[in-house]
Each structure stands twice: as C-alpha cells, then as structure tokens.
C-alpha cells in the first residue's frame, strides 16, 4: 500500500508529490546511490532493508546541480523506516523532480522571490544521480532556472505638465455615439409630435408646425408658403376667413379691415355717417331719430332740439356737459333763462320760495308774484 502523499510548501505555493509504483529493488538502488553521492556527511550510512518490510518504499527528494541544500538538524542514524537517515532538504518549487507519473510543476514564481543559484555545484552527486536515472530510462533533471537578465532601469519620461495638472486624473472618455436622427425639442402645435430638423417645418404664430400639418382649419387647404389669416389662434385661408367676417349693416359687403359696431351691427367706416351732412361719425357720439337714422349731434339738435322761449335758441349741451331742459307752462327754457321777469332772479325747479310762481303766463318769483297780485295788474 502506497504511503500518504507528502505536502511541502515553498514560496507560498502548495506542491503535492505522488509517489510512483515501482519495484522495491529499483527504488532502493536509487536511494542508496543518492545517499552515497551526498558529500560532507560521513556519519550517515546507506539505508538497509528491514526484514519483513513492505514492498513499497519512499522516494526521497533530490537537489539539482547548482543548488546547495540547507543545513538541517542532525538525525540519529538508527531509523526504522527502511529509508535513508539523511533528513530531506527543503523542497523548492523549481527544484522538484519531474517524474513520468507526476503532474507538471506550476510556473516558477517571479525572479525576485527565487534564491540565487550557487556558483559551485556538487559534481559528484550530479554525475551519480544522472547515471542512475539513465539506467531507469528516466529523462535527466531540468536545468536550474537562470536568473532573469535585468535590463537598464526605465527612465521617466519628461513631463511638460504642471504639478497641479499631474495630480489630476485624466478625464473620462465620452462614448462616441452616432444617433440615427438628431434630437429636437420642437413639438408640432397641431399633431403634438416631434418636429425633426430633417423635416419641412413652418413657423407661424410663434409655434412650430409640420409642413403637412399647417393647413386651413376649415377646408384643410395647405397653407405652407401661402398667405393666411389668424382668428382665435387658428390659421385660415382667405376665402374661409372672409366667410367668418361680418357684413356691413348699410351696404351688405364683408367688412375686411376696420369695423365699426353700432346698433348691434357692423359697418364700414365710410358707411357709418350722418344722414344730414354725410360726415363720418367714427368714434364720436351720435344720435338716432324715431326711424333709427344716424345723426351727428349738431344736426340732430338743430332738427330735434327744443327752442328756448326766452332767447329763442335751441337747447344744446355744450362742452360735453349735459343740459337740462326746463318745461313750464308748455314752454322750454334754458337753465340760465329760467328767471323771474321782474327781479331776474334764477328760479328753482323745486316748489320753494325760490320756485316759479307764474301769473298771466309770465314767470315770477314768490315776492314779485305777491306784489303783482296785490296791485291787481300784471
């Protein structure tokens, strides 16, 4: 039965050596030759086979040429394990014996961790060990690893950056993207979809439209590149816009430009005039007769204003002020003409002592009326 695999640790790498199955005589010869070829240890003798020992022995580690074994503590030569009494040297990763039945060793560690090779190899041990391996038809051990050739130290490249700039990390590279279409934030005011810069667009009424969306809202006529009218925020063509316009209350034509609204109708400025003098009323005040004819104020007062019975002038408001018409005994008077005929005091329209006390179709104040009545004459 094979012995338990030995585990050795070198340079922080775990190496597992599996002993091969060989004849006892061949293994013992290899051990004996290795022990005899080891120099500088005269007190150790060749291993002997114990009577009744098993048919499987232990294969000892070996050192390649150019490696010096580390000194170990002295071990008594009286060992009963059937092998050599020489303590095994420390096993290195690069110095493990490659066997036919063993797994290949792992890659060597960096050159900095490897110990420098010895300059004086043990020629006697190497020669005897190679001859024994040739008899067993085994390949010779690999040559010791050579130290890496150190090149010239790297020279730092001259830097033209300032110290503050050298401390800053490089900016991240922006990914290069190739969009299929350019981004746009314009939205069509009709279909509420994005207006791409590659599409024909119309800008009107401070909004963006697709060329096919900018149409008359009544007849759906294309308005791109055409004159249009705006009404209530909607684009209209000229015929549809004229259909929405009001017609003049006098001539019956459509009012396209300036419009005058009066009497619940629309008029052209040239149609809204005085029926007497044909003067344009415009934004001035006007008056109507019983037939709803339009008059300017001057012509209306001349024709329809009452006449004062004292001065015989029409009672017309002046300077934009309202004028009151005073009626008494079927006659009309100006406010300034409504006075007592004897003392010329202004009469009040209220029934007070300052009011009018007529006598024989004449205007008197109360004191004058009493005097005239007492005298019995007018």
Curated annotation (Swiss-Prot):
Residues 281-378 are annotated as: PLEKHC1-binding. It is found in: Cell junction, Focal adhesion; Cytoplasm, Cytoskeleton, Stress fiber. GO terms for molecular function: filamin binding; metal ion binding. One of its GO terms (biological process) is regulation of integrin activation. Gene3D superfamilies: Cysteine Rich Protein. Residues 186-247, 248-305, 306-375 form the LIM zinc-binding domain. CDD domains: LIM2_FBLP-1. Residues 1-69 are annotated as: Filamin-binding. One of its GO terms (cellular component) is cytoplasm. InterPro entries: Znf_LIM. PANTHER family: FILAMIN-BINDING LIM PROTEIN 1, ZYX102 PROTEIN. This is Filamin-binding LIM protein 1. It comes from Bos taurus. The lineage of its organism: Eukaryota, Metazoa, Chordata, Craniata, Vertebrata.
């Amino acid at each position: 039965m094979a012995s338990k695999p030995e585990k050795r640790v070198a340079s922080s790498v775990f190496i597992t050596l599996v002993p091969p199955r060989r004849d006892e005589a061949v293994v013992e010869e290899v051990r004996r030759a290795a022990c005899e070829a080891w120099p500088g240890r005269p007190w150790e003798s060749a291993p002997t086979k114990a009577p009744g020992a098993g048919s499987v022995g232990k294969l000892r580690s070996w050192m390649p040429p150019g490696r010096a074994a580390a000194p170990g503590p002295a071990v008594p030569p009286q060992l009963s394990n059937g092998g050599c009494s020489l303590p095994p040297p420390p096993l290195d990763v690069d110095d493990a014996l490659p066997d036919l039945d063993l797994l290949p060793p792992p890659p060597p560690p960096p050159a900095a961790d490897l110990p420098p090779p010895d300059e004086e190899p043990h020629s006697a041990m190497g020669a005897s060990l190679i001859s024994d391996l040739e008899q067993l038809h085994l390949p010779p051990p690999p040559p010791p690893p050579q130290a890496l050739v150190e090149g010239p130290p790297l020279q730092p490249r001259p830097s033209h950056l300032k110290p503050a700039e050298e401390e800053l990390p490089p900016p991240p590279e922006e990914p290069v993207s190739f969009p299929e279409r350019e981004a746009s934030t314009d939205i069509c005011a009709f279909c509420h979809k994005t207006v791409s810069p590659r599409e024909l667009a119309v800008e009107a009424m401070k909004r963006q439209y697709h060329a096919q969306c900018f149409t008359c809202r009544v007849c759906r006529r294309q308005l791109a590149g055409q004159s249009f009218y705006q009404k209530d925020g909607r684009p209209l063509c000229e015929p549809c816009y004229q259909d929405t316009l009001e017609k003049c209350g006098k001539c019956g034509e459509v009012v396209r430009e300036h419009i005058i609204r009066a009497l619940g109708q629309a008029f052209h400025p040239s149609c809204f005039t005085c029926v007497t003098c044909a003067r344009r009323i415009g934004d001035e005040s006007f008056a109507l007769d019983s037939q709803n004819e339009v008059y300017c104020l001057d012509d209306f007062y001349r024709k329809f204003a009452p006449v004062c019975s004292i001065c015989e002038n029409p009672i017309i408001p002046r300077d934009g002020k309202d004028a009151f018409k005073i009626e008494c005994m079927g006659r009309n008077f100006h406010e300034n003409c409504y006075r007592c005929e004897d003392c010329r005091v202004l009469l009040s329209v209220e029934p007070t002592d300052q009011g009018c006390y007529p006598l024989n179709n004449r205007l008197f104040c109360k004191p004058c009326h009493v005097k005239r009545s007492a005298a019995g004459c007018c």
